[in-house]
Amino acid sequence: MALLQISEPGLSAAPHQRRLAVGIDLGTTHSLVATVRSGEAQTLVDSDGRDLLPSVVHYRRDGHSVGWQARDNAARDPENTVSSVKRLMGRSLDDIQQRYPHLPYRFHASDNGLPLIQTPAGNLNPIQVSADILSALAARAEAALGGVPDGVVITVPAYFDDAQRQGTKDAARLAGLHVLRLLNEPTAAAIAYGLDSGKEGVIAIYDLGGGTFDISILRLSRGVFEVLATGGDSALGGDDFDHLLAEWLREQAGIHDRDDRQLDHALRAAAVKAKIALSSAESASVSIAGWQGDITREQFDSLIAPLVKRTLLSCRRTLKDAGLTPEEVLEVVMVGGSTRVPLVREQVGTFFGRTPLTSIDPDKVVAMGAAIQADILVGNKPDSDMLLLDVIPLSLGLETMGGLVEKIIPRNTTIPVARAQEFTTFKDGQSGMMIHVLQGEREMVADCRSLARFSLRGLPPLPAGGAHIRVTFQVDADGLLSVTAMEKSTGVEASIQVKPSYGLSDTEIATMITDSMLNAKEDVGARRLAEQKVEAARVLESLQSALVADAELLSNDEKGVIVAASEHLHTMMQGSDPVAIEAAIKTVDQQTQEFAARRMDASIRRALAGHSVDEV
């Protein structure tokens, strides 16, 4: 008899055959690909021995180039050379034009408002451009490993929203890659350092790359990586250092023409060269457009000091979220090429009161961590007991009556996670329910971010409160949110996967959290008022139905007293005093207790009509 060959999910049927896995750091400025060889993570290089691949694509009518060659074409053909495309991922055209007004590209809007970049190769969206970068990294990996990778882990900024994460997955699919999972960049760095150094305790991951800044506070203990809190700014990075320095050079050189894009690129290139030189020297010489001069490290520091201060403010907020002080942080890990700037290392060290860790190349550490995770996920390390816990940045919830927000999953909850809560109908015979999904920390819908709406229809026509709807929020390991609503008695179900069309910056997230703290007292008052108004409306709705059905159980005087109490409650509902509304509700309750008892007796008599005592 033939035997079925069964292997564990994710493992090769041949137990001694290693599967090919890579980690990709899809960066704003540069990208890398890494793998695990002989138990050690290492980056894969190109034919010239270079680890870094510039995240730049140059488009021609007959094709495109990626990386170093594309970057060299940027000065000659800036309109058709796309760089920092990561900043455009998941954003609308309006959003991009507001955030990045100086981009040299020619944009068009697609039918749904998403950006299309006009190139000789056609109109391309950011996902397609990212796919070209990923294809180049995949080709490098295939050449180095001698085969197509079985799986890949791709890193993304901690605050990428659902649309940006989904866009990254779509780009990988276009590039022919099998994505095992997306991994937050700071978390990838924690994996690399956790395995290499074996540290246990609280660690801060300070990640300042070309286009984004992330700060993550993690607790490492016996192989468990738990993200306690995250923060940052998705519109702040080394590119901004370059921009400030380029503007300084423009002023020094007396360059007033802002329409010459080749000159703009030359200014940016000179700024980058000077920045790199100032990381190891006290001054740097610059030659641009016939002007020659020097810039000192002190001058450069004064230019970028406000930006560095912004990163430290994010650090302070994130530590507060984690309930920690800088003194409780055991180590500070520096990630991203921009952390080579001496002022950054100095200021971060001063803030945390300790010298930051830089033993792993800050450009490579994220890709190496991703490679380690990929190696585990394809089954090359089945005995690994490492557990990775990410968190969601803002609370998720839904709208309830009165414009209130019911939080289902609080912010900084570890993911993946699923939470469910039961709700009911407000009116008699209600056959549908609108589910409004929200994100934020405030108490009222108007103060939170709307993520999605969907309808649950086909509810059984029961009295108010009779139908029971179970709403489940599920956030997967990649941070994508699915919401399902199901009526329990009928099994009627509706669901949605939340994919916002706009990116949410870390600054906006920090503002939302700060606003919730500043307005906490007012929000509690507003919630109490709204809750009392909802309860008052429910009481009046129920009373009106009772009067229509059983008014004959009351004398005219009794009915007059109840009507007067209900009218008083209706008047109080129009005001803004929750105490007065609550008192009016109690008055209605007191005046209707006898009526409720008579209705109960009448209901029992109707139920027993035509039945003998023995039958009962």
From Swiss-Prot:
It holds the Pfam family HSP70. The keyword ATP-binding applies. GO terms for biological process: iron-sulfur cluster assembly. GO terms for molecular function: ATP binding; ATP hydrolysis activity; ATP-dependent protein folding chaperone; unfolded protein binding. Chaperone involved in the maturation of iron-sulfur cluster-containing proteins. Has a low intrinsic ATPase activity which is markedly stimulated by HscB. Involved in the maturation of IscU. PANTHER family: HEAT SHOCK PROTEIN 70KDA. HAMAP family: HscA. Belongs to the heat shock protein 70 family. This is Chaperone protein HscA. It comes from Pectobacterium carotovorum subsp. carotovorum (strain PC1). The lineage of its organism: Bacteria, Pseudomonadati, Pseudomonadota, Gammaproteobacteria, Enterobacterales. The gene is hscA.
